[in-house]
Amino acid sequence: MLRLSLLRSTATLPVKCQRRGLILPAAAMYTLGSLIFGKEARLADAMERGELHNKNVDYAKEAEERTELRIRALANTRPMEPRYNGHVPLHRYEKLLLFAISGWNSFFHPEDGYNIVQLGEATALPVFLENLKQTMLSDSSGRRILKEQPNITTEILHMDKLAKLPHNTFGYVYYQWLKRENVSPDTRAPVKFIDDPMHAYIFKRYRQCHDFYHAITNMPIIIEGEITIKALEGANLGVPMAILGGILAPLRLKKVQRKRLYNIYLPWAVRTGLSCKPLINVYWEEMLEKDVTALRKELKITLPPDLRTMRKERAALRKEIDAKYNSQKRATTPA
């Protein structure tokens, strides 16, 4: 009997060990889960009751102070304190890098306006901006612009009113040009890298008036039109980036585009830019209700041949030649 009892206890031993082997890991997992999820539950309850945060601490103020400290730390690496809203002071080597990189990108990717914006500021040397400032100071309208520092936006221009002006007014012509080209005066980038606040405003004014030059000359914003207006700005205002654009940008165009520019539009742009009134002194916001023909005469601006029409005529001629060629080819090809 004793032997039989020992055999039975020995036989049941592995089963108990197996159960114990299952129970111990399960208990450990339960304990670990309770610690993790219980802690998260207690944390959530504390947050709900408002007990998590110290009520005596202004967390928003602390975050603002940390941000301010980071800005100060960054400012300590700059050559000077920012002198106007949005100003990013650059070291001389950074300006050279900005010029090199933006110049390279502008040549190979002229369709990206951001490259043009950076190149414009990188080449806006203080001597050029000071000369432009003196040009404005020598004219009554220019002096008023510098004093009042108007900002050209759709809100200031009242686009809904421009749409209702007589069709012969500059304001209506400008409105129709914006609509046709699908652009807005609100899209002009702010000035960031020019150090002197007055110089920065002058360059901002030049940048914001760019579309007025397009509208009064009826020039589209396609690449040929942009090069033409840049050449006009270079001849009239001496803008370094505009001069570079007028010289280098045509090199990447098709032969027929270069021919149009060199034979028609660049000579017109240089001639008009040298002979017309300094466009930086025009208070364009006050010219919107004037007769556009009279305004062109006052500014000594003559219209160039319509670039859109010339391109359409060229495309129609090419289509006609291709059709004749294909017709002759089919006629001479044996069946």
Swiss-Prot record:
Single GO BP term:
ubiquinone biosynthetic process
The residues that cross the membrane are: none
The yes or no answer to whether the keyword Chloroplast is present is no
Query: Where would you find this protein in the cell?
Result: Mitochondrion inner membrane
User: Which cofactor does this sequence's record say it needs?
Assistant: Zn(2+)
Q: Name one GO cellular component term.
A: extrinsic component of mitochondrial inner membrane
Residue positions annotated to bind Zn(2+) are: H210, D211, H214, E226
Please list the residues that make up the transit peptide in this record.
Answer: 1-10
Chemical reaction(s) catalysed: 4-hydroxy-3-methoxy-5-(all-trans-hexaprenyl)benzoate + H(+) = 2-methoxy-6-(all-trans-hexaprenyl)phenol + CO2
Q: Describe its membrane topology.
A: Peripheral membrane protein
Q: Which InterPro entries match?
A: Coq4, Coq4_euk
Pathway listed for it is: Cofactor biosynthesis; ubiquinone biosynthesis
Q: Which UniProt keywords apply?
A: Lyase, Membrane, Metal-binding, Mitochondrion, Mitochondrion inner membrane, Transit peptide, Ubiquinone biosynthesis, Zinc
Extract the Pfam families matched here. Coq4
| Domain of life according to the entry | Eukaryota
Lyase as a keyword of this entry, yes or no, is yes
List its EC numbers. Answer: 4.1.1.130
> What do we know about how this protein assembles, alone or with others?
Component of a multi-subunit COQ enzyme complex, composed of at least COQ3, COQ4, COQ5, COQ6, COQ7 and COQ9. Interacts with COQ3.
Belongs to which family? Belongs to the COQ4 family.
Purpose: Lyase that catalyzes the C1-decarboxylation of 4-hydroxy-3-methoxy-5-(all-trans-hexaprenyl)benzoic acid into 2-methoxy-6-(all-trans-hexaprenyl)phenol during ubiquinone biosynthesis. May play a role in organizing a multi-subunit COQ enzyme complex required for coenzyme Q biosynthesis. Required for steady-state levels of COQ3, COQ4, COQ6, COQ7 and COQ9 polypeptides.
Q: What name is this protein filed under?
A: Ubiquinone biosynthesis protein COQ4, mitochondrial
Organism annotation:
Saccharomyces cerevisiae (strain ATCC 204508 / S288c) (Baker's yeast)
- Highest lineage ranks of the organism? Eukaryota, Fungi, Dikarya, Ascomycota, Saccharomycotina
